[in-house]
Amino acid sequence: MDPLTFDYEKLHVRVDRGVFELFQPNDLTTTLRIPLHWLGVLVHYRKPGRPGELIFGAVNDPRTALYGTDLASFGYRSTMAVRVPSSDEPLFRAYFTEVAAHAGRPVI
């Protein structure tokens, strides 16, 4: 299977052989590499009409939804410097729905 990749602004993510990797060329200190069974992803909107925060992290329970993860389910989380307008959220949902299918994990 070829790696599943997704690019958004200066964010590059990929899944290959059960491992998720995240890269931001302008900030290599926020590179993330994590097995799919621990991955949780959420676009968190605090205020209506404002871009949301993109959150990646490790979940405590691998049966937790891979995308749309509840904030309380994260054992560790990191907010990326990427803001996601609600009009772009379906792009993330489509990619992570495909990733979740490969990992045997649900999405919300």
What are these regions (language model features)?
Residues 3-4, 28-108:
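Acidic, Ser/Thr- and proline-rich intrinsically disordered linker/docking segments
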Residues 6-28:
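Short, compositionally biased strand/turn segments
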